[in-house]
Amino acid sequence: LNVCSLWRGGTHGGWGAVSGLPDVDPALGYYDDGLPEVADWEIKFMVENGIDIEHFCWFAPADNQIEPIKRSGLGFALHDGYFNAKYSDLMKFTFMWENSKVNTTNLEDFKKYIWSYWMDYYFLDDRFYTTENKLVFTVWSWQNFKEAFGGTNEGANEAVAFMNEDAKAHGFDGILLFFADGSAADPSSFTAMANLGASGAYAYHWGQAGNNADETIYRLKGNSSYDKLYIVPAVSVGFNDIGWSNIRKPLISTDDHKKVLEFIKNDYLPQQTG
């Protein structure tokens, strides 16, 4: 489950934008990310509904990280909440490198300041998500990933090769790296992601179109049909950002949500290989 943990008083926008809108009141009330009790309630809600992996946004503290990281940006929900939650062992976690600011300009700085932090704080934690003993994580912008390592496919592939090698040096069998697709729906974008060494791509969400089951199914079929790399079957609900846009937008119905899930279970996944 993708989560962007922006909900702590005094950080980011806080609750002010939505506090006058009872139809979007959170089930937990106006909570603070970072409280272990909040994390435990979230874990309870998720595991009771079949969700076993929480996918946090990870923000580097600097636009260009050239010193050791003491604390990642907006990391309260993961570091103070989930890590200290009583029931955190009931589900796994991973992260999306939210690299909209690129965060590094070369592989050596990435190794020294970002990758080493991930290894120490996340990858070696027993709760970190792996499959087939491979570390699984994602990146927000494939274009910025490429820019971070010299702006070339060769530079990006060198970085991915390093990640695989270092993961193996720490007892894993490599990495699985997925790029958010940035709403791409063309084969050239997915070819570009594959050329950077990605294991696959996924939709962070489907935007407002995510409230329509047929549109979601159409996009999944289309992106997968290009056969450039594996497409993770994302399930979205729409994008009701009324607190910021002042426009109320409908979310997906339970029937349409079920329709997408059943399509993925019964049609999409059985056709996947590799």
Language model regions located:
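Glycan-processing catalytic domains of CAZymes
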Residues: 1-274
